């Protein structure tokens, strides 16, 4: 799945000291978030779970792009933040966040395990129901670069 590109003048990710800082990822399909609104109001929990998995897929795709461009591989997920647009009565935000956590653990094994924050908000960009952002570490691939072995 190709990750959604930023709609405005910001970077999808930035690397500093082998850490990838990833911009917030929405569940865009063909450039658009298809189902908009708040979880349990306009969006079912099942649809929110589907969208959170898409967010995680986009995030992982950007991490792969960042790693490849820097001749590295993804080392580990350092932290994950999950945002859920919902009303104050909805108490299932952690269950939704579990879907993103499970995705990264499935992809990276123990290196996909991470600390996590989950936040309920009244509205997200483009009226999306869910969004994630994260930080991940990159590791140089083993090899000989400029006469040095890594």
Predicted regions and their residues:
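Short glycine-rich or small-residue beta-strand-to-loop segments that form or flank ligand, phosphate
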Residues: 79-85
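N-terminal presequence-like segments and the immediate start of the first folded domain
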Residues: 1-57, 61-78, 89-150
């Amino acid at each position: 799945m190709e990750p959604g590109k930023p709609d405005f003048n910001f970077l999808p990710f930035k690397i500093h000291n082998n850490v990838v800082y990833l911009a917030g990822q929405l569940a865009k399909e063909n450039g658009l978030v298809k189902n908009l609104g708040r979880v349990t109001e306009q969006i079912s929990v099942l649809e929110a779970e589907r969208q959170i998995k898409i967010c995680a897929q986009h995030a992982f795709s950007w991490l792969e792009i960042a790693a490849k461009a820097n001749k590295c591989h993804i080392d580990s997920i350092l932290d994950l933040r999950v945002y859920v647009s919902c009303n104050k009565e909805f108490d299932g935000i952690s269950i939704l966040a579990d879907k993103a956590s499970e995705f990264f653990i499935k992809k990276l094994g123990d290196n996909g395990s991470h600390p996590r924050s989950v936040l309920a908000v009244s509205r997200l960009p483009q009226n999306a129901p869910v969004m994630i952002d994260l930080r991940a570490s990159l590791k140089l691939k083993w090899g000989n670069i400029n006469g040095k072995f890594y």
